[in-house]
């Protein structure tokens, strides 16, 4: 399987791919990358699941889209009990969601947040093809749409999220998956090491360090 590093995008790359998506799906990309919701959770969101007037704004994850063996779309409970959660949103994403709701989402509380022009759940195959075209147009190395969940976990870890916070935010049932992302970026580790070195240098200025 691919390493975590092979599944990552930078914040600017996420913005570039989002800009290359059809307008209706741009904010879906941003929400995936900055909230960490699974694709099925994103596609199940309705107006009733969002509280953009709270501070910070938040979404309630309480259902997920599943596709049956017959190809039918069904709303189901999330993957695990820990997947039922409240996820807070950064302010720029909140602003983008407000604009998205106004332009693309029907007024009813049950209206899907990310839907086709007819208000139905987009087919994952179509969404995946659209995503691949956007990656190519943006000149971004191809990662899967699902990989935005991994991207979100690294963004949160780099922002200082602790292990319990990552588990709660991403809906992990065990620490194992979340731990991966606390160590995912070698460049971040290099930054940390450099900062430690600078602190050590400051501490030893004017003094002799003895073993």
Where are the model-predicted features located?
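Basic, Lys/Arg- and aromatic-enriched nucleic-acid-binding interface segment
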Residues: 1-45, 53-55, 66, 82-84, ...
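Short, basic (Lys/Arg/His-rich) helix/loop patches that form interaction surfaces
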Residues: 15-26, 35, 87, 95, ...
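C-terminal secondary-structure termini that scaffold catalytic or DNA-interacting sites
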Residues: 19, 65-93, 106-107, 116-119, ...
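Residue-level signal for well-ordered alpha-helical positions
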Residues: 20, 45, 99-103, 181-184, ...
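Short, polar N-cap/turn motifs at the start of nucleic acid-interacting alpha helices
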Residues: 49-56, 142, 161-180, 204
């Amino acid at each position: 399987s691919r390493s975590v590093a092979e599944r990552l995008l930078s914040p600017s790359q996420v913005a570039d791919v989002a800009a290359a998506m059809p307008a209706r799906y741009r904010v879906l990309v941003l929400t995936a990358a900055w909230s960490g919701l699974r694709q099925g959770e994103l596609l199940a969101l309705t107006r009733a699941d969002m509280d953009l007037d709270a501070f910070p704004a938040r979404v309630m994850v309480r259902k997920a889209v599943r596709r049956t063996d017959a190809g039918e779309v069904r709303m189901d409970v999330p993957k695990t009990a820990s997947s039922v959660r409240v996820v807070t949103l950064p302010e720029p994403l909140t602003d983008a969601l407000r604009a998205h709701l106004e332009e693309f989402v029907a007024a009813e509380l049950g209206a899907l947040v990310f839907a086709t022009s007819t208000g139905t759940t987009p087919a994952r195959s179509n969404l995946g093809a659209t995503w691949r075209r956007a990656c190519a147009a943006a000149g971004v190395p191809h990662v899967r749409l699902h990989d935005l969940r991994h991207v979100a976990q690294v963004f949160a870890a780099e922002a200082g999220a602790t292990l319990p916070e990552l588990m709660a935010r991403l809906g992990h049932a065990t620490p194992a998956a979340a731990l991966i992302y606390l160590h995912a970026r070698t460049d971040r580790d290099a930054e940390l090491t450099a900062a430690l070195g600078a602190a050590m240098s400051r501490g030893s200025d004017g003094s002799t360090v003895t073993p």
